[in-house]
């Protein structure tokens, strides 16, 4: 099985230290937004193969037919902290989104069968399940994601251009 079977390209993720500030600057300077902001608290957390509870802040904005995601570490230790220390702010990953929980779990199993490294993964019941996979061929991270937007709470904040939330 090919890893992207049934997946669609969902978003491009960028790591930042100040999520609200970055969203505001992108809205003001580049017209990107509005940004829907959440604190994400996975109930299952693995970092480099070991349990490691973490939370993070995420902001999403529609850009044309795609989405930009800003991520900032919040609590606990995660690959977000490591990346910021080693590389600073900037591009982090490209996301492939799967239509069902079973589909993303099969993709994660396929990644493991292929011997690829999952450096971080997390999930919360049937709301979301994600994994960051190292694709050595392009020296980059690819996120495998299932997300049920109907089960997300409303955004904690909306930053920029308009007061109505954009698509997730």
Go through each PLM region and give its residues.
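Long, hydrophobic N-terminal alpha-helical segment
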Residues: 1-52
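Conserved short beta-strand elements that form part of the metal-binding/catalytic scaffold
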Residues: 33-83, 128-151
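Extended intrinsically disordered, low-complexity coil regions enriched in Ser, Thr, Gly, Ala
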Residues: 20-39, 85-89, 100-124
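Surface-exposed flexible segments
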Residues: 23-29, 81-87, 154-164
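Vicinal oxygen chelate
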Residues: 2-3, 9-17, 59-64, 69, 83-102, 108-168
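Short acidic/polar alpha-helix capping motifs at helix-coil junctions
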Residues: 20-25, 70-74, 95
């Amino acid at each position: 099985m090919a890893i992207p079977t049934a997946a669609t390209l969902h978003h491009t993720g960028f790591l930042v230290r100040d999520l609200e500030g970055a969203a505001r600057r992108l809205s003001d300077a580049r017209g990107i937004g509005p940004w829907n902001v959440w604190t994400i608290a996975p109930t299952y957390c693995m970092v480099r193969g070991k349990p490691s509870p973490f939370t993070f802040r995420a902001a999403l904005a529609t850009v044309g037919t795609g989405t930009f995601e800003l991520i900032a570490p919040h609590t606990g230790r995660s690959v977000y902290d490591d990346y910021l220390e080693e590389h600073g702010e900037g591009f982090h990953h490209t996301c492939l989104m799967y239509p069902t929980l079973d589909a993303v779990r099969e993709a994660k199993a396929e990644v493991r069968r292929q011997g690829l490294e999952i450096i971080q993964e997390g999930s919360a019941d049937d709301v979301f399940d994600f994994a960051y996979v190292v694709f050595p061929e392009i020296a980059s991270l690819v996120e495998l994601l299932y997300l049920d937007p109907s089960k997300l709470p409303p955004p904690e904040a909306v930053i920029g251009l308009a007061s109505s939330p954009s698509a997730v």
